[in-house]
Amino acid sequence: KNCIRLNAHALARYAALCQQAQIVPIVEPEVLMDGTHDIDRCFDVTSEVLQEVFAELNNQQVALNGIVLKPNMVISGMDAANRADIPTVASATVKCLSENVPDEVPGIAFLSGGQTSEEATAHLSSMNEMGPHPWQLTFSYGRALQAEPLKVWSGVDGNIEAAQEAFIKRSRLNSLARTGNYHPQMEEA
């Protein structure tokens, strides 16, 4: 609990300093998906972290309408015996956000946090299908955007164009997920 409080304080201080410099802070309280925990445990820990982060943001007088929140999705651990399905992840994540994120936060940009490209895209789309929400739900993926293009490229100059096409495809699919219009069948197109 002390670590959560200290990290929340550091995030809030960073956000306050950014706003003082007229920079929009990206506040990233990540709960890792490493381990065997179930989705309920992730929900509880994510809720606790978000509550502490917003308490600290308020203490630091951060304007919540001037931040981007970059949290994890509420998801089972990577090594969990029973991983939650797409609709369960989406509904648990939206419920957690609804209970812990003030409506004045304009945008939530999810990190992929070790999910596969397909999982991250499907989860985002499912959440947006459940909308409207008081905040915009979007993506700020690293690995989930880059994994397939890097695999296609494999360091071979002759694969650059195919890798670029793979990146464009993944970006398009996430753009569709952003509006709730992604469908898994699109992976094959």
Task: Report each predicted region and the residues it spans.
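Glycine-rich, proline-tolerant flexible connector loops at the mouths of alpha/beta enzymes
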Residues: 1-2, 31-37, 78
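Glycine-rich anion/phosphate-binding loops
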Residues: 1-14, 48
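Short, contiguous, pocket-lining structural segments
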Residues: 3-6, 19, 41-45
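Membrane-embedded alpha-helical bundle segments of multi-pass proteins
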Residues: 6, 13, 23, 27-28, ...
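Substrate-engagement module of ASCE P-loop NTPases
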Residues: 10-18, 53-58
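Short beta-strand segments at enzyme active-site cores
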Residues: 22-32, 63-72
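Active-site capping/gating regions of soluble enzymes
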Residues: 37-189
